[in-house]
């Protein structure tokens, strides 16, 4: 069954059809995902919720073009991912998808400014535009005053704000956040979700974030509940 969460002519930013993902575990195969079909509309703040080991990260890796399904099809931003070669897929991912991780994944020897700027350096953006975008994103996440500080000088919440700015600085169509509040206290985690939500509305960027905390469901436009690798409770808030 395909879950179509919104009606309308706009193509979804993500479309999965009968997706399965198996991993080898010695002589046997372990099913991480089983028969997942879903559609996520554009300009949507979506959540994947489920316990640890339910398949959330595996699903994000498929949507993020980091891994390929064992069965089924994955379309992202209107493109069939299976049609890309390795180099084209890497370029597609760099242009269209931003990533936010629970452990922040910041470069420790770079300042907050340099961490946010780094993706723009990789694509060869002109210095003036690079500086404009970097400063604008740091301001958007409330870290203009901390631009020259390194990660070890920042709190956990500030590090995640840097990671959010870095994910958005290339103006991607889709941002994926894997347990973005897992290493934060409750109040800081709530502020990070609220920040992502505000930026999503302002920039009209699609967000998909995973969490094991069902209390965060109220922040999402749409939720998918995953258990034992299967989509068990799609819903619209």
Question: Could you describe each region identified by the protein language model?
Answer:
Residues 1-22, 233-237:
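ABC-family P-loop ATPase nucleotide-binding domain
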Residues 223-235:
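H-loop (His-switch) and adjacent beta-strand-loop-beta switch element
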């Amino acid at each position: 069954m395909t879950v179509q969460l919104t009606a309308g002519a706009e193509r979804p930013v993500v479309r999965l059809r009968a997706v399965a993902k198996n991993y080898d575990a010695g002589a046997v195969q372990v099913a991480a995902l089983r028969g997942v079909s879903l559609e996520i509309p554009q300009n949507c703040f979506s959540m994947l919720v489920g316990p640890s080991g339910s398949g959330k990260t595996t699903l994000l890796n498929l949507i993020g073009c980091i891994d390929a399904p064992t069965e089924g099809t994955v379309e992202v931003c209107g493109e069939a991912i299976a049609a890309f070669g390795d180099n084209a897929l890497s370029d597609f991912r760099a242009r269209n998808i931003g990533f936010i991780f629970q452990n922040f994944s910041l470069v420790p020897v770079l300042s907050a400014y340099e961490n946010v700027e780094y993706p723009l350096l990789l694509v060869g953006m002109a210095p003036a535009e690079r500086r404009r975008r970097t400063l604008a994103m740091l301001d958007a996440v409330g870290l203009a005053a901390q631009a020259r500080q390194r990660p070890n000088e920042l709190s956990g919440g500030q590090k995640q704000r840097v990671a959010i700015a870095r994910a958005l600085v290339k103006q991607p169509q889709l941002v994926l956040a894997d347990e973005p509040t897992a290493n934060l206290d409750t109040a800081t985690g709530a502020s990070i979700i609220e920040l992502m939500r505000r930026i999503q509305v302002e920039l009209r960027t699609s967000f998909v974030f995973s969490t094991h905390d069902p209390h965060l469901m109220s922040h999402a436009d749409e939720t998918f509940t995953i258990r034992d690798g299967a989509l068990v409770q799609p819903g619209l808030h």
